[in-house]
Every structure is written in C-alpha cells, then in structure tokens.
Amino acid sequence: MLTNKLSASRRVYTAVMRALLLLAAVLTAALVVFMIVYVLYKGLPYVTWHLISTKPSYITGAIGILPDICNTVQILLASLLIVLPLGVGAAVYLTEYAQSKKLVAAIEYAAETLSGIPSIIYGLVGMLFFCEFLGMQTSLLAGALTLVIMNLPTVLRTTQESLRTVPQSYREGAFGLGAGKWRVVRTVVLPGCIDGIVTGCILSAGRILGESAALLFTAGFAHTLNKFVIGLASPGATLTVALYAYAKEEGEFDVAFAIAAILMILTLLINLAAGIVGKQIQKRSQQ
C-alpha cells in the first residue's frame, strides 16, 4: 500500500515537473518568436533601397545607413580575423600543450572574469588605451580591438570545451601511427571540434553586431563612408550606434526599427554561413 502511494506521488511529481519544464520552454520560445516578429513587423516596411544605399545628409535632411552598414562589416571582419586565431590558438595551447595546471586554471579564471565585465567598462578602457595611449584616436580599428578583448574569453572557452569532447583514444591512435603532436592537433583534434569553433564564431559575431556601448567610446558617432581597410583608421558609427542615435537623439523610431530588422537579418545570414562553412570543413577533414 505504501509502495503504491509512493509510486503515485512520484508520478504526480514527475508530471508536474515535466509540465513546468514544458511551460518554461514554450514561454522562452514564444518570447523569442514574439521579439523577432515584432521587430520585423515594425522595421521591414521601412527597409528600402534608398535607406540602405545612401549616405545621410544634414543639409538636405536625407536619411541613409550605407556608411553604418559598411562600418559594421569592417569592424566585424577585423574583429573576427584577430579574435578567432587568438582564441583558438590559446585554447589549443591550454588544452593540448600546457603542462602547468595552475597556469591553465589562472587563465581560465581570468577569462571567466573578463566575460562578466560590463561592455561600457571595455569601452572606457579601450578609449584610454587604444585611442589615447596608443594614439589611434577615435577609429574603427580602436573599436575592433576593443571588441577583440571582449570576445576573446567567449572564443577561448567554447573552443576549450569543444576540444575536451574529442576522445583521448583518437589522439592515442594517431600517435600510435607515428603522427607528431602538431599533426595530431591539426588533422584529428581540430576537425573533431569544428562545431565548437563555429559556435564561438557565431557567438562572437552576434555580440559584435549587437555591441554599442563599447563602440560609443572608441569608434564614435560619425556617419561617414570610409574606404575598406584604409578606413579603419577613421571614426565611424556602426548599425547599433546608428540605431541608438536615431532613436534617442533624433526620435526617428521608424529608422531605428528598420536598422534592428537589418541587424536581425544579418545575424541570421551569419549563422547560416557559419554553419555551412563548418559542415564543409568537416566533410573535407573526413575525406
């Protein structure tokens, strides 16, 4: 009798917990879908070719975000080209080569600490160090380097966790065939954890696209169309900074929602592209 009561109470408890977990999952998905649909509903009607292909003019009052799109792409590419080799290289060293456990623990603790620092503090430090101390002034390069420091812990930790999922037997089998350490890392370990590297890239790209506080101090507000690569030495506003400026300073909420919709579309395209590239790399490594 007692056993039946315990079994019944456990079934009730399991059913209640399952219902609560399902409710939490549904609410989370609903909130995400609502936010995406709402932003696209409010913003897409104002996304026009004229908006994305022209420069703003304070003389004529014309509104355009072409410089902001170009500046965003430049900062995104510059940041990823620096942070990915640094983060992946550091993760490989700490996981595959480092002998001192204290060193590994210290670096991991530092990375965890850095990932919790507010972005506005990164912006202040970037302004003082890159803009003032190194003499870069307010520029896209200073903003990109600040974002590198912000995203380095993310790439480092995601790559580390992915490297640790590669079975040790894979390494031992490669060593048994006479492969050296670097060859094992390059041909066995890295292809086996490409999903984690792609995840780190996606997370970093999303944070770079959505960052504004750090760039306000380092890259500036200027809606100027800078030349590719050479223009990294010049100031420029990104899409998120432009969104803030149009919504807060100028009261152009329609333009702000249009920029938000463009940012969502860019994030989706980056996620799709990163997933495709990751699958192609995996296929080539398995051939």
Where are these regions (language model features)?
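Transmembrane alpha-helices
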Residues: 80, 158-159, 181-219
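C-terminal transmembrane helix and the adjacent membrane-cytosol boundary/short C-terminal tail
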Residues: 94, 160, 164, 202, ...
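Periplasmic/extracellular loop-to-transmembrane helix junction in inner-membrane transport proteins
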Residues: 2-20, 37-79, 100, 245-254
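Generic hydrophobic transmembrane alpha-helix motif, especially the helices
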Residues: 112-150
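Amphipathic cytosolic juxtamembrane alpha-helices at the membrane-cytosol interface
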Residues: 14, 99-103, 171-199
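Transmembrane alpha-helical segments of polytopic membrane transport and secretion proteins
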Residues: 1-25, 274-287
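Transmembrane-helix boundary motif in ABC transporter permease subunits
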Residues: 79-111, 124, 274-283
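Interhelical loop and adjacent transmembrane-helix boundary motif
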Residues: 56-63, 215-264
